[in-house]
Amino acid sequence: MTATRRTAREWAIQMLTAADLNPPDDVQAFMNGYWNQISDLDEEDGGPAEAKGKLKAFAEERVAGVLGSLKELDDILVPILDHWDLYRLGTVERAVLRMGVWELKNTDVPKAVCINEAIDLANWFSSPKSRTLVNGVLDRYAKAVSR
């Protein structure tokens, strides 16, 4: 498999989901442990080491960014969720929404790309119903910040 930014986002969601279930004391050590466990970075996948390093950095930026600003991200999400408690959502949905808001807030990735990537991640790791939730929440946030 050739790794892409989509793959890096998948890695980030896997790490964020694991971190939500068992919060790490040392984020870098946590990420290093993850890299030691996955097979996507094996030499036989054919991708150049430099490209893999950039994708690892892309994923790590998101994981460290989200974990470093959980309270801020949750404070943004709670009012948008209306009458839903953040912890009533599934772990995957929380991770996808947090990373989606973080990307919208902290990167120059176009809003439509951020939202579509988050929708696809929710669909891949959770269920088709999650797509609707993620789309609605991130779209509301994107519209609110662009005013």
Descriptions of predicted regions:
Residues 1-147:
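N-terminal interaction/assembly modules
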